[in-house]
From Swiss-Prot:
Domain CP-type G, residue spans: 16-181
GO cellular component terms given for this protein: cytoplasm
Keyword Hydrolase appears in the UniProt entry: yes
Organism from which the protein derives: Geobacillus sp. (strain WCH70)
Domain of life the protein comes from: Bacteria
Subcellular location(s) per record: Cytoplasm
Assigned keywords, A-Z: Cytoplasm, GTP-binding, Hydrolase, Nucleotide-binding, Ribosome biogenesis, RNA-binding
Name this polypeptide is given: Ribosome biogenesis GTPase A
GO molecular function annotation: GTP binding; GTPase activity; RNA binding
UniProt family annotation: Belongs to the TRAFAC class YlqF/YawG GTPase family. MTG1 subfamily.
Binding site for GTP: 60-63, 133-138, 177
Amino acid sequence: MHMTIQWFPGHMAKAKREVQEKLKLIDIVFELLDARIPLSSRNPMIHEILGNKPRIVLLNKADMADETVTEQWIAYFERQQLHALAIDAQTGTGIRQIVSAAKEMLKDKFAKMAAKGIKNPRPMRALIVGIPNVGKSTLINRLAGRNIAKTGDKPGVTKAQQWIKVGKEMELLDTPGILWPKFEDEEVGLKLATTGAIKDTILNLQDVAVYALNFLKQHYPERLKERYSLDDIPGEIVALFDAIGKRRGCLVSGGAVDYDKVSEIVLHDIRTEKLGRLSFETP
């Protein structure tokens, strides 16, 4: 399958420009990634866009990711001199660490301000960046403690930018995520589709399910057996589709397996943790 998907709505090009304009107002950036696919959910231009602005990497949806793998990712980012935290904006895991980690990172800057005689330094100003559907709005709501940002499960739901107070110590600028103009890497697109970061209408659903099942077969075979009551996992991917389809009653007239329906079921099960905590990338 050839993948050169143009998925770069006009508001994203604008967001990139706006992020670079707003960096002048910002003390620190929170780079929000999906803990299950930290590299695939990362904008490849992020270093160029953010320059040397202080940054904390937040591995969101960590409660859905394989804990052992998430620990490896935290170590990976630390080796790159990037402080990383495992969080889950939906459940609240790790949220309290965010403000204290930012304070720690900015303490020298604010100490200098105090030394200059600024008695009541302003709140830290932070910017959250991330691709669509990685949980930016949910994180803002969690940090602000009230329902401000519009959240939804449809990618690209956040459009406008706004400042939001987080207690007395921080102000947050919410900005729509930035996704690269095209996926050079086919696997990146498939991972984003598997986790629901891009709309199901963008890629062929069966292609995504084939990718996901091949991955699960290799890395989480016992979960597959348990979820779909399989005695063993067939070698051929079509046979695996057939086995799941028969177990789940996904049949069309004449008794053939409905592969689209099987694809929907498998992807829904992945996204709703019916197969447990999964990570689709390791460092």
